[in-house]
Amino acid sequence: DLWQVHTWDDETPLDDTLTALDTAFQSGRARYVGISNYSGWQSARAITKQELVATKAPIATTQNEYSLLNREVENEVLPCSKALNIGFLAWSPLGRGVLTGKYRLGTPSDSRGASPHFAGFVEPYLDERSNRIVEAVQVAADGLGYSPLEVALAWVRDASGVTSAIVGARTGAQLRGILRSEEITLPQVVRDALNDVSSY
């Protein structure tokens, strides 16, 4: 239903990328098209180029990494998606798994952080700043009777401009936690505290 270009490509003219989206949309292969991992200006450029011609496929979504550990999209991408009225999809809302708390006491042997293939993906979020945020999420979870996963997902879900979060589960327990997060609401005082500890 939704086909997104994975990332901006400096080697490919933007018009070629957008033409590929048009082809998928107009042929019925995709009901909606979007962009992923574009900066604010790149997003605005792609969206407005498509809007200039009524027969072009409208950009429906942008997808970027967003979590308590990475709030960079709040500077440009979220304001862009809100101003241009397109959906925002947050990928890695659990901060590459770190916000679940599983790395608090080290790197579990069965985790992505222990995998030679994914260690470099997780490692940037194993620093002191991230540790402070993970501890704050744990304190909030303990106080509210939720899991850290539920707190982190609820925070992303309710962030201004977020349409949805892209989540993945390897186990039934993870899936249940993800689904439970839809049933909770974080008190404003907790949101404010998490905003403060995770601000840049």
Give, region by region, the residue ranges found by the protein language model.
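Beta/alpha (TIM)-barrel catalytic core signal, keyed to glycine-rich beta->alpha loops juxtaposed to Asp/Glu
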Residues: D9-D196
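Acidic/hydrophobic-patterned starts of short beta strands in beta-sheet-rich repeat architectures
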Residues: L2-W3
